[in-house]
Curated annotation (Swiss-Prot):
Helicase activity toward DNA substrate is inhibited by micromolar concentrations of 5,6-dichloro-1-(beta-D-ribofuranosyl)benzotriazole (DRBT) and 4,5,6,7-tetrabromobenzotriazole (TBBT). Helicase activity toward RNA substrate is inhibited by elevated concentrations of TBBT. Inhibited by some ring-expanded nucleoside analogs. Residues 194-334 form the Helicase ATP-binding domain. Residues 693-732, 754-779 are annotated as: Disordered. Keywords: Acetylation, ATP-binding, Helicase, Hydrolase, Mitochondrion, Mitochondrion nucleoid, Nucleotide-binding, Nucleus, Phosphoprotein, Transit peptide. The modification Phosphoserine is found at residue 725. It holds the Pfam family Suv3_N. This is ATP-dependent RNA helicase SUPV3L1, mitochondrial. InterPro entries: DEXQc_SUV3 (IPR055206), Helicase_C-like (IPR001650), P-loop_NTPase (IPR027417), RNA-DNA_Helicase (IPR050699), SUV3_C (IPR022192), Suv3_C_1 (IPR041082), Suv3_DEXQc (IPR044774), Suv3_N (IPR041453). It comes from Mus musculus (Mouse). It is an enzyme of class 3 (hydrolase). Its EC number is 3.6.4.13.
């Protein structure tokens, strides 16, 4: 090697290398980590410094996803380390690395720097692959490995390089303290300086359902010079919006999917009715009303009530809800220096639990409401009621708001023959219903536990009281409410549940903001959004009065669109869009919307019509009805995004008009729901699932897209006269008659019985013989 070349290479080495091959790595190790365990003057480790500064729990390292560090390829300057020393023997290097891995001292030192057994193993595997697969190594590590080969250095001298590599694949190790500060959620009141700048008057209106607590708060809201109403549902926000304007108080409406202004030229009204997530904590009001404050404990949405409670900038804040929330609210507002005035209310009409169960649908009376906790029970009960010659209205959670209101009006109308309501717990709030008797079809409700697992548990006292309280409301035709169960065995349990005291609410929900997630991403730029959320929740520090809300739905959306190239802020907004992850079509629509956005292609009205295969026909069966509900949710998703990205979702008004048309189609389907149930039962009777896929799609409307199942332009009334395609003509006569709506399952059974009874005895024996021979083949 020439002298100039040697001088150049030597100059590139880090300062301190001139002390010799043995001294250099040792000094590097001391400079980075200090003396080894047992020696004085050891550098404090990350874990120790974190503990000292915050006293926080150790992080869940299973959430740390290692990044990939690619081995170094050939260098333009050649292998400088080999030129200064010699080429490394890969077999010798592998032995050195294996010895390094097995050293107990190294494992202990790694643990001090936050590398538990799992992280240490993953970091070592990556470190070894990097060393073994690189064409040329950095000069310093090459020299250390060479020195170890010649016993001129100790294997422990590799630790600084190993730690540097570990921090490359686990960047969270480098910034633990910063991440803990960002995710410190222990003083939420400080997030709202505008609210803290004034002394608010807090009035808690406490009472059971139908006690008038919300009425008194709304009266104060209407008399104020400015006000905001924060409700849990779009239906409630709409109701206050209409009441306020009807009372001559100009009021705007703000929900996730809708904005309505009443003043000319779009000027903001003095009052606004909104869903609680949409309240503006920067706008000053004279009066604010927060409805259903007990939902501050909700595992998914509780953060919105916490934000409204601590952040609304109003002279008076009126809270309406259960008494179970009084203590927690008082404790939270004690930290802000605000006192809570409690006004308690009693129920306006009496309600009683009957001593007998319904036991049979034959015992139904006008004004009865059967509460089910599954759609299958809704369909089954509705069908049984129809068989008895009675009409029923149907309300469940996934129905569009307009359809729910239409069914409520039908049930409440004294001139309508529909006197029975079949509903889920969706009737617990948001609808004014004239119910005389609540009948619990079951007391078991599916729920999702903290691990995301489905559980079947009896309803809570709070849930039972909320639902039972819908009977005999003050404004209804029935001045006394009654509650019972469908089955005799459930009645004692219902009485026990209703007589239990409601457990006081222990904690309020919190939720990371977009700004906090952005700061996390600044420190962990290569980490996925879903993983960022996991790490944030794990690092988050809250006191006993708060909890971090369940973010599984957010993470589901984040993972769904992870491969789409979007900025972090845009990705965050898409992930906060409210979707039902049980609806595949809605999930695929979110993905498609994000993909279009990433291409900078506006999602126009024409594009959306093509996407959903508009126009859509009335549903032919229950599955079609569910598909139409999914399309309605897709419209909601479009409208929700249109208020966040107006340039990319420009046709909100046209989509809203289309959604109203779809709402009418769904209303027609729900009105005829018992007919849809009949057809669905007929499909099961005929075992249509065993037909060829083409015939099945012809009968059931099945296709790749939910919207396509009801695609077409002919009206439902012309279906019986539609010409049959060649494939239809090959179907059995019974299948074709069911397809055209001319026969139902009950009709087929009756025809079969009549045909058998009219045959001579010897003919029936032959038929029976043929069936017996056929059965083994069918198995």
């Amino acid at each position: 090697m020439s002298l100039p070349r040697c001088t150049l290479l030597w100059a590139r080495l880090p300062a301190g290398r001139g002390a010799g091959p043995r001294a250099a790595p040792c000094s590097a190790l001391r400079a980075l980590v200090g003396s080894f365990p047992g020696a004085s003057g050891r550098v404090p480790c990350l874990a120790a410094s974190s503990s000292a500064s915050g006293g926080s729990k150790a992080p869940n390292t299973s959430l740390f996803v290692p990044l990939t560090v690619k081995p170094q390829g050939p260098s333009a300057d050649g292998d400088v380390g080999a030129e200064l020393t010699r080429p490394l023997d890969k077999n010798e290097v592998k032995k050195i690395l294996d010895k390094f891995y097995k050293r107990q001292e190294i494992q202990k030192l790694s643990a001090d720097y936050g590398l538990d057994a799992r992280l240490f193993h993953q970091a070592f595997i990556s470190f070894r692959n990097y060393i073994m697969q690189s064409h040329s190594l950095d000069v310093d590590i090459h020299i250390v490995l060479n020195d170890i080969c010649f016993s001129a250095a100790h294997v422990d001298d590799l630790f600084p390089f190993f730690l540097r590599h570990a921090k490359q694949i686990f960047p969270v190790l480098e910034c633990k303290d910063d991440l803990r500060k960002i995710s410190d959620l222990r003083i939420p009141p400080n997030w709202y300086p505008e609210a803290r700048a004034r002394q608010r008057k807090i009035i808690f209106h406490s009472g059971p359902t139908n006690s008038g607590k919300t009425y008194h708060a709304i009266q104060r809201y209407l008399s104020a010079t400015s006000g905001v109403y924060c409700g849990p549902l779009k239906l409630l926000a709409h109701e206050i919006f209409e009441k306020s304007n009807a009372a001559g108080v100009p009021c705007d409406l703000v929900t996730g999917e809708e904005r309505l202004t009443v003043e000319p030229e779009g000027k903001q009204a003095t009052h606004v009715s909104c869903t609680v997530e949409m309240c503006n904590v920067a706008t000053p009001y004279e009066v604010a009303v927060i409805d259903e404050i007990q939902m501050i404990r909700d595992p998914a949405r509780g953060w919105a009530w916490t934000r409204a409670l601590l952040g609304l900038c109003a002279e008076e804040v009126h809270l309406c809800g259960e008494s179970a929330a009084i203590n927690l609210v008082s404790e939270l507002l004690y930290t802000t220096g605000e006192e809570v005035e409690v006004q308690k209310y009693e129920r306006l009409t009496p309600i009683s639990v009957l001593d007998h169960a319904l036991e049979s649908l034959d015992n139904l009376q006008p004004g009865d409401c059967i509460v089910c906790f599954s759609k299958n029970d809704i369909y089954s009960v509705s069908r049984q009621i129809e068989i008895r010659g009675l009409e029923s209205a149907v309300i469940y959670g996934s129905l569009p708001p307009g359809t729910k209101l239409a069914q409520a009006r039908k049930f409440n109308d004294p001139n309508d023959p529909c006197k029975i309501l079949v509903a889920t717990d969706a009737i617990g709030m948001g609808l004014n219903l004239s119910i005389r008797r609540i009948i619990f079809y079951s007391l078991i409700k599916p729920s999702i536990n903290e691990k995301g697992e489905k559980e079947l548990e009896p309803i809570t006292t709070s849930q039972a009281l909320q639902i039972a309280g819908r009977a005999g409301r003050f404004s209804s035709h029935f001045k006394e409410g009654q509650v019972t169960t469908m089955h005799r065995d459930d009645l004692a349990l219902l009485k026990d549940i209703l007589n239990r005291p409601v457990d006081p609410i222990q904690a309020a929900g919190l939720h990371p903001t977009a700004e906090q997630i952005e700061m996390f991403a600044y420190h962990l730029p290569e980490t996925t959004l879903s993983n960022l959320i996991d790490i944030f929740v794990d690092f988050a520090q809250v006191d006993g009065q708060y909890f971090v809300c369940n973010m599984d739905d957010f993470k589901f959306s984040a993972e769904l669109i992870q491969h789409i190239p979007l900025s972090l802020r845009v990705r965050y907004v898409f992930c906060t869009a409210p979707i039902n992850k049980k609806q595949p079509f809605v999930c695929s629509s979110l993905l498609q919307f994000a993909r279009q956005y990433s291409r900078n292609e506006p999602l126009t009205f024409a594009w959306l019509r093509r996407y959903i295969k508009w126009p859509l026909l009335p549903p032919k069966n229950i599955k079609d009805l569910m598909d139409l509900e999914a399309v309605h949710d897709v419209f909601d998703l479009y409208l929700w995004l249109s208020y966040r990205f107006i340039d990319m979702f420009p046709d909100s008004s046209l989509v809203r008009s289309l959604q109203k048309e779809l709402d009418a189609i769904i209303q027609e389907g729900v009105h005829n729901i018992t007919k849809l149930i009949k057809i669905s039962e007929s499909r099961k009777l005929l075992n249509l699932e065993s037909l060829p896929s083409g015939d099945q799609s012809r009968l059931s409307g099945a296709s790749k897209s939910p919207a396509r199942r009801t695609r077409g332009t002919k009206s439902a009334g012309n279906k019986a006269t539609e010409p049959l395609s060649p494939s239809d003509k090959e179907l059995p006569l019974a299948s074709r008659l069911v397809q055209q709506g001319l026969l139902t399952a009950d009709m087929l059974r009756q025809l079969q019985k009549e045909w058998l009874t009219q045959q001579p005895e010897h003919s029936r024996e032959k038929v029976g013989t043929r069936r017996k021979k056929k059965d083994p083949d069918s198995d």
